[in-house]
Amino acid sequence: MRRYGIWLTAATVSLLGTQVLGFAMAWVAAGRGGAFAGLVLTAINLPRVLLLLAGGAVADRVGARRVMIIADVAMTVLMLGLAGAALTWGEQPWLLLGAALAVGVVDAFYLPSSGSLPRLLVRGPALARALSARQLAGQFVAFTGPPLGAVVVASAGIAAAALGNAATFALMAVVLLGLRLPVPALGERPPAGGFWRQAFDGVRTAAADRVLRPALVLTAAAAAFLLPVSGLLVPLLARQRQWPAEAGGAVAGALAMGTAVVAVTVLVRGAARRPGAAAITGLMIAGGAVAALAVAPGVPVALGAGLVAGLGTGLFSAHIAPLVLGSAPGTHLARIQAVLVLVQSVPLLVTNNVLGGLADAGSASVVLMICAGALGVATTVTAVRSDLPAARAADAPLPAAAG
């Protein structure tokens, strides 16, 4: 776990720099109107989604560490260029759009590689603990990044945020250069073949696997109907119920707290022996709590429902992520991670808009009940019609480390 701890520390610092820059870009873009702010977000997300499968194939072909080093160096250069351009020409719209497109392209190659790296650094039984530590680090960054970004952009502008981000990417590249990773065995190296065939082979492999297929379907359901609850539906519910903004924030905070409690528990005590069953149970609990949130008569009940929803969310995410990563064939680690990011990103893009529109046209409570019902159907079908409940954590030994 020592090597993993070194990498996770550097990755957390790098992610903090990215969060600071992300807030700075969003703030500057919002100053030019909501339509332009949405265009900047699209410029990041569209190339990321379109190129994810290619990014996974490249990582499986040439190695996740090598891809990450190249991406970190590229982002260091890009951030330095953004800082210099912002100081020279100001915070121009074309500059924001160009930077957003470049970030989206690099992300498409970086995310599958970084997602597969824990499997190369940590043995099977400790994988759930390792991913829980990463989840906690991500929540810490999500909590501290935007306020820090606000301070930076208000006091020094987007150029300072870009310079700080460049420094964190450079740090990440240095850490990766000194990190020893295991050399895959011959049987774990991807076979030769056409590039695009290899890229889409991750989808075929996931669809054919009796554990990966239901795990990814359940992940897509969670992305579509659980992730929008905190960021979209809770604020809408609070406004429609005429609760103060602090109440809506407290409910969202209770959900985050519940998720963190489970992550800490798994980090300290380890994961369940049957992660598939634990993940299904967690999503069932979260769905029930979302239903309770929909009919909550006041803020205290909503707070309790939010906390339980967070506990269920944490139980699901703390077990589904290591199960997917541990079940992936050694030849397809990054490609399966690319598919995992896709099944989280695409449904969320669709349902955020659909659910928001439904809540505007009717009631946030009704939309929350729809989400709860969809989660209930997804978990029940998965529990009854798939092999996921019986799935156990993978326990594959690590190969020897390379110098």
Predicted regions and their residues:
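Alpha-helical transmembrane-bundle signature of multi-pass membrane transport and export proteins
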Residues: 1-403
